[in-house]
Amino acid sequence: MTCKNTRRLYQIITTFLRYGIDEIIPDIPLTRHARLGRKALFWVRNQHKDQPFGVRLRLALQELGPVWIKLGQMLSTRRDLFEPELAEQLALLQDSVEPFDGKSARQIIEQALGGSLETWFDEFDEQALASASIAQVHTAKFNQNQPLAGKDVVLKVIRPDIEPIIKADIALMYRLASWIPRLSNDAKRLRATEVVREYEKTLLDELDLTREMANAIRLRNNFENSEMLYVPEMYQDFCHKNVIVMERIYGIPVSDVETLKANGTDMKLLAERGVQVFFTQVFRDSFFHADMHAGNIFVNPNHPENPQYIGIDCGIVGTLNQNDKRYLAESFVAFFNRDYRRVALMHVESGWTPPDTDIDAFEQAFREVCEPIFAKPLSEISFGHVLLNLFNVAREFNMEVQPQLVLLQKTLLYIEGLGRQVYPQLDLWQTAKPFLQNWLNEQVGVKAILRDLKQRAPQFREHFAEFPEAVFNALQQQKQINFRLDELNKTLQAQGRQKSHNVRSIVSGVIILGVLWRFDDLPLWLSCGTLVTVLLVLLLQRKS
């Protein structure tokens, strides 16, 4: 470890000590050296004994700076790992820091674009419009030499020298994380190294603004001409790893409820559209904005009777596959139907809990945790907390962590919070139910069968010529086996007809399995056709 890293580690440790965070260190042999180290730093006292632990942890992270603030924000979404009071305190962390010098921002932009700012822009404001731990934004407008002359823009700039700071602090986090699981079984459950690895990926992705650009373009295309959501345009010719240029938007912050009401906004429709936007992203697009907190969501002040959201900052997004979406849709529908066995089976069928899981015990665990939720009216039930309860139960049955679902659950909590802030009477279930049912119908209904056949048509054409021969071979094999069965029957007659029937049934079952295995590479309906043919032959032979 370098001298610089050692100094930083000392700073981190003493900061935690001044806020009494060391009280969580258990008195066990493994922590003996840590406790001795605490005594060695006897002059560093807990200066905030009158504050609850959650408040002290939040203040400590705030003092340690941007990297630790963002870690706390991420941990606040992991309500499957922490007590609600602690998670709520971490959620109060604000990613707002002093801006760096505007002249430095100008220099970074000019270096990225390869020329003076005045070549492309007028009215560049060196005073940052907003500043966060990773980047800050400045305003300008395209000059008369540009096709979009006079268009207002925002330039986002990565902080200088932030990457080495992040990497140094992440390295220290890994050291601390490797020690945590040895403290206790509860500490193992935190999976601290996985949390740090997930956080590292998120941070490093945010350092590459071309990712944000690509995400914004994809989201904008998904909602092109939509009345529900508008995503500002990215000007790709001006976008680089550390600088992006985008359309400037003018909207009302979604958290400014009084201004929205004064503008005549239809608050009920606005709240419902927030839920609709989220579920459209999840079930239609399999791609969702995963950082939809109040600072990134605005409302178009025009046509307030038909309110439209404006979404910015697409640095963090989530993606889902068919298995993820099926899990979500079926789990929610089964939950609201109070079909806890189906919820349990969904976790096993998804492959996220071991195949030998005791389904009866799993079902009962879901029932005990979820049934009390129905003491509330359906309109007051939180989807985010339902998902959290499902995760908590599943973890007790060794469910593997699904980062994409954790990200989705965090986003769902944001959406619910904003929706009920805008319109407290929002009925999430009634708003989301059509999306869930329509998606399930499309996956298992007639449309799904026709779509599957259409997708498999090339395979069918390729294997069609093999079908008659395959059926003929299967029937020939059946004849040979029947001959041997008859021989076997003669020797078993003394033991009664029932045993003979059982043998025939067992062997027939083996044949059927063999046919299924033999044609597993054929289209679904072609394999089924072969199986039905063999079954008919068996039935006719049995009657004869």
Swiss-Prot record:
<dbReference type="InterPro" id="IPR011009">
    <property type="entry name" value="Kinase-like_dom_sf"/>
</dbReference>
<feature type="binding site">
    <location>
        <position position="156"/>
    </location>
    <ligand>
        <name>ATP</name>
    </ligand>
</feature>
<keyword id="KW-1003">Cell membrane</keyword>
<feature type="domain" description="Protein kinase">
    <location>
        <begin position="123"/>
        <end position="505"/>
    </location>
</feature>
<feature type="binding site">
    <location>
        <begin position="129"/>
        <end position="137"/>
    </location>
    <ligand>
        <name>ATP</name>
    </ligand>
</feature>
<keyword id="KW-0547">Nucleotide-binding</keyword>
<comment type="similarity">
    <text>Belongs to the ABC1 family. UbiB subfamily.</text>
</comment>
<feature type="active site" description="Proton acceptor">
    <location>
        <position position="291"/>
    </location>
</feature>
<dbReference type="GO" id="GO:0005886">
    <property type="term" value="C:plasma membrane"/>
</dbReference>
<dbReference type="GO" id="GO:0004672">
    <property type="term" value="F:protein kinase activity"/>
</dbReference>
<keyword id="KW-0997">Cell inner membrane</keyword>
<keyword id="KW-0067">ATP-binding</keyword>
<keyword id="KW-0808">Transferase</keyword>
<keyword id="KW-1133">Transmembrane helix</keyword>
<dbReference type="GO" id="GO:0006744">
    <property type="term" value="P:ubiquinone biosynthetic process"/>
</dbReference>
<comment type="pathway">
    <text>Cofactor biosynthesis; ubiquinone biosynthesis [regulation].</text>
</comment>
<keyword id="KW-0472">Membrane</keyword>
<dbReference type="Pfam" id="PF03109">
    <property type="entry name" value="ABC1"/>
</dbReference>
<dbReference type="GO" id="GO:0005524">
    <property type="term" value="F:ATP binding"/>
</dbReference>
<dbReference type="InterPro" id="IPR004147">
    <property type="entry name" value="ABC1_dom"/>
</dbReference>
<dbReference type="InterPro" id="IPR045308">
    <property type="entry name" value="UbiB_bact"/>
</dbReference>
<dbReference type="GO" id="GO:0010795">
    <property type="term" value="P:regulation of ubiquinone biosynthetic process"/>
</dbReference>
<protein>
    <recommendedName>
        <fullName>Probable protein kinase UbiB</fullName>
        <ecNumber>2.7.-.-</ecNumber>
    </recommendedName>
</protein>
<dbReference type="InterPro" id="IPR050154">
    <property type="entry name" value="UbiB_kinase"/>
</dbReference>
<keyword id="KW-0418">Kinase</keyword>
<keyword id="KW-0831">Ubiquinone biosynthesis</keyword>
<keyword id="KW-0812">Transmembrane</keyword>
<feature type="transmembrane region" description="Helical">
    <location>
        <begin position="522"/>
        <end position="540"/>
    </location>
</feature>
<dbReference type="InterPro" id="IPR010232">
    <property type="entry name" value="UbiB"/>
</dbReference>
<comment type="function">
    <text>Is probably a protein kinase regulator of UbiI activity which is involved in aerobic coenzyme Q (ubiquinone) biosynthesis.</text>
</comment>
